[in-house]
Amino acid sequence: MALQIYNTLTRRKEPFVPLEAGTVKMYVCGVTVYDYCHLGHGRTYVVWDTVRRYLISRGYAVTYVQNFTDVDDKILRRAQQEGTTMEAVAEKYIAAYFEDMDRLNVLRADSYPRATQTMPEIGALIDRLTSIGYAYPAAGDVYYSVRRFAEYGKLSGKRLAELEAGASERLQDEELARKKDPFDFALWKGAKPGEPAWDSPWGAGRPGWHIECSAMVRKSLGETIDIHAGGEDLQFPHHENEIAQSEAVTGKPLARYWMHNAFLNVVNSSGAEEKMSKSLGNFKTLRDLFEVFPPMALRLFLLKTSYRNPIAFSAEAFKGSEQNWRELEEVLQLAGWIAGQGRPATDDIESEPWVRRFNEAMDDDFNTAAALAEVIALGKQLAGRYHAAIHGTPLADPARFAREWRTFALLCDILGLKAAEPEARQSALPEAEIEAQIALRRQAREERNWAEADRIRKQLLDQGIVLIDHKEKPTTWRHADP
């Protein structure tokens, strides 16, 4: 079937028809760079990276743009806490973002526009909104007049009448006094003492968050794009306000397809699920999790649930994904062994039923849960035949095995699942010593001396060796991820 995408704007799945055949213009809202990324951020950018990878695999030329919000109240507060500048804070956490995403094998965007590098375009957009009556200056600020945009609420489904109750209570008195309507939002904020500011026709100040993205989309990709994506928490008010700003100026849709990924929840001490967020203080940074879990196992865990469904994270829930990744990685590392079988594979992998079923799953609104299930099933089949072969049962059809392995590797690549490089996995421990320790552990297990068996396992892990226990075959081992 043709690719179907759930469009938040229309609240239904629709056939994907890009503006220009064969090309996709895609914009993803990036992080506000004031802290390290948590697993919720990991989910967001793994999801959209996988969407991008799949579109590329289907022959589209994808231009993928993701911004950095590098001027914001949170960044200013962090700069004050750390006794440094807003610029230094932004650079620190942008570098940390790239380190984390590289470990999750998230491809680099084609460009990363920053708010501070888009000030002329932001100013021009605000000026245009003011000149056509959609915005007004007020005591050094500039506000967007929400009621002027007749279609406000079309993305989120929210109506102003429903939002009206309590709207004024959410505002500070001095801000409310400057607004013509409690719903209006800031496009430009007048300068405050000690804060960075830029010159403008309305006085020195800095832009509001929503206008930054409207300007960056317009500058990087044009007036209308194919896909605008982000976390579901951005649907309102951020994306709603982007639409109001951009479409008031152009009279054209900002994006043809709006896509939003669901939250990643954590299981709290009472067993209830709650959104992972910095404001709730329940978040786990990616770099902390990397100390405990292999990055690719985290990526696999995030792909096990389709992007529009929430994920409940706990250490217990993660264990199955870690084992899945160990098994998949073992198969991914068979390239050298396959070459040694002496029978090259044919190039015809698109005809493989595995590819067909994988594509059917991904064509159904990027259903990574179903697509990954196909990859895991294929990996288990290949692993079974490989283990039989190394224990004396020759492959019935080496060429077919090689072809299916290439199919497996291709599908893993589309999902962004990548085995660690061999040189990064090396341990100084001699292989003979590893096997000797495994034998001692096997003896301890036979004697039901679980404490000793666990001690040996941990000792090997500390030296970079991961043991993999199997139900019906001897324990195997692999080098740990870097």
UniProtKB/Swiss-Prot annotation:
ATP binds at K278. Gene3D superfamilies: Cysteine-tRNA ligase, C-terminal anti-codon recognition domain, HUPs. Zn(2+) binds at C29, C213, H238, E242. Keywords: Aminoacyl-tRNA synthetase, ATP-binding, Cytoplasm, Ligase, Metal-binding, Nucleotide-binding, Protein biosynthesis, Zinc. It is an enzyme of class 6 (ligase). SMART domains: DALR_2. One of its GO terms (biological process) is cysteinyl-tRNA aminoacylation. It comes from the Bacteria. It holds the Pfam family DALR_2. Belongs to the class-I aminoacyl-tRNA synthetase family. Monomer. This is Cysteine--tRNA ligase. It comes from Gloeobacter violaceus (strain ATCC 29082 / PCC 7421).
